[in-house]
């Protein structure tokens, strides 16, 4: 499919009776993913399985994106593939361990730095992070969100974060985002406004 040229994609759309523009858009977007060296034609989940084995043994895994650090599509693709597998595995294991605490999966913390890149309103619905924040505490998975601009994070996801730790915020929208859904917000807002650099509340 990815090797087809524009005319061949249009012909395929007619053959399988789908919207030509929709198929062309899909074709173009998939071809863009093909430029990432980690996307290969052969089907394999070895890397994901190895990461899951590390997590099972309690070994920390840090994903660095190196040359792809400015490629949002690479972040979203990898984060989605990996976290969906983690979510699925932890839900299954929690269900299988129902009533047997010894079989529950090892607690896991998924940390997202620069979270607004993954959790903005336009992107959060395309990822599983909202589900993880909302549902996975009962499956021993916790989402740790780290960001200097919490106002860039989807309101639904922010509302699901149980514990919030904040350093000095100088933007009102960021303060409002941290305060949303917090009891005693007025008093805490006063404390936040008086924080020195490197202090937290």
Tell where the protein language model's regions lie, with residue ranges.
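Conserved ATP-driven motor cores of ASCE-family P-loop NTPases powering translocation/secretion/packaging/pilus
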Residues: 130-201
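P-loop NTPase motor domains
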Residues: 1-134, 197
